[in-house]
Amino acid sequence: MRHDSRPPPWPLIALAAVGMVLAYSNGFGGTFVMDDVSEIVENEAIRTLWPPWVPMFEGGRLAHRPLPYLSFAMNEAIHGLAVPGYHVVNIGLHCLNGFLVALIVTHVLRLAGWRQQPRIPAEWVGAATACLWLVHPLQTQAVTDIYSRIEIMGTTAIFVAVACFLLGRQAATARLGEASPCARACWAASARRP
């Protein structure tokens, strides 16, 4: 919920998106490595989307993570075993997580009483934090290793749950039904691990 009419920091957001694509674009030419081989290339269960529980719970050698495995099956249905398609999905999820970081930081600052004491809007601090988070070298494995989509999706679910909590906390009249997105995000976070 916006407290004023300031526009979002679009230049900073655009810079973050360009920086992220540049930082991770070298992964597009990569191949399937390590766990990618047994869990994607050699996993016959992800070659089907119907019934959905087949890719979610069958095949592969490692413990199953239902939602990521379903996403691998969707990738396989659209791109086959073309590696760039898998990287595009990982980068898209990472970009979504960057947006959620900006949202969370902005709302936490507002809840803490940030009133532009240093003359920097909370939106700009949130966007700058997201920029740093998006291109930080520690994110490289999660974004460029295809099988690490499991970690990206878990992070997405946790960030959605936190964002829903913060937005619900700001709402003047919270109703029980408004907790539903938060509960679903918590379930999604737990569904990424056995």
Q: Residues of each region from the PLM?
A:
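Polytopic membrane enzymes that build or remodel cell-surface glycoconjugates and lipids
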Residues: 1-194
